């Protein structure tokens, strides 16, 4: 037990030692919250315990992002493909969404966080939908960090949905063919009105996007870590941001 707390103190100290340039903080950070299942397996625990531990990490990272001045934080929580998981795990995940909102929404509201969800919410359980709508309504006028939780989200599904909307507008003669371009497509995505992610972070050692923000991440920087999400700390976030600040973003130029 003593070693655990010593490690925590060491990590906190390391976090404070990482210097962040306040003038170059990413406006939008996207994170693939991966490794909950691995974390649980390493401890001979049910996968659901890994997801629960991951909730604590969300709380810490949201607070750190708010403190650093990040404007948008998008967290990949449940993909369109995750419905293929065992039913008991899916049910537990949906319950955790409701639990997280119930426990955290007052604190988020107090800290001026705007709560938002991206993805096809209509496919989620009714209680989950109600919790989401209530949280969005409560925080909609806040002026701090916008927290996007990606639920029943898939990058390809998002693009297909946006293209269908555009096609319908074209059929209805609301737009002309010449109007269709990157700007119009972006306006028909779940992230409309938000800047694209400056950096996409993925813990757990996996080196892929997993159908996450495919359109929006065209020019994002990527940062990968072998740490599982429940063990991801404020210090790890600062390392990612520090690395981002030392990169030269060219956006296709020289």
Model-derived regions: residue spans:
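Flexible, compositionally biased loop and terminal segments
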Residues: 1-254
């Amino acid at each position: 037990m003593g070693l655990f707390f010593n490690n925590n103190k060491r990590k906190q100290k390391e976090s404070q030692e990482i210097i962040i340039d306040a003038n170059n903080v990413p406006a939008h950070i996207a994170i693939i919250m991966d490794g909950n299942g691995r974390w649980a397996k390493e401890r001979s625990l049910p996968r659901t315990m890994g997801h629960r531990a991951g909730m604590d990490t969300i709380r810490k990272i949201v607070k750190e992002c708010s403190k650093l001045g990040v404007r948008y934080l998008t967290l990949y929580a449940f993909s369109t493909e995750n419905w293929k998981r065992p039913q008991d795990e899916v049910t537990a995940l949906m319950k955790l969404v409701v639990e997280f909102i119930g426990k955290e929404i007052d604190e988020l509201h107090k800290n001026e966080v705007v709560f938002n969800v991206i993805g096809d919410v209509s496919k989620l359980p009714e209680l989950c939908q109600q919790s989401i709508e209530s949280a969005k309504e409560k925080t909609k006028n806040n002026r701090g960090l916008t927290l996007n939780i990606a639920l029943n989200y898939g990058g390809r599904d998002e693009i297909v949905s946006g293209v269908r909307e555009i096609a319908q507008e074209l059929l209805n003669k609301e737009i002309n063919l010449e109007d269709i371009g990157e700007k119009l497509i972006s306006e028909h995505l779940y992230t409309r009105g938000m800047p694209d992610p400056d950096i996409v972070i993925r813990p757990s050692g996996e080196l892929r996007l997993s159908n996450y923000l495919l359109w929006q991440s065209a020019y994002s920087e990527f940062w990968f870590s072998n740490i599982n999400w429940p063990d991801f700390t404020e210090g790890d976030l600062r390392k990612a941001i520090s690395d981002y600040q030392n990169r030269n973003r060219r956006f296709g130029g020289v």
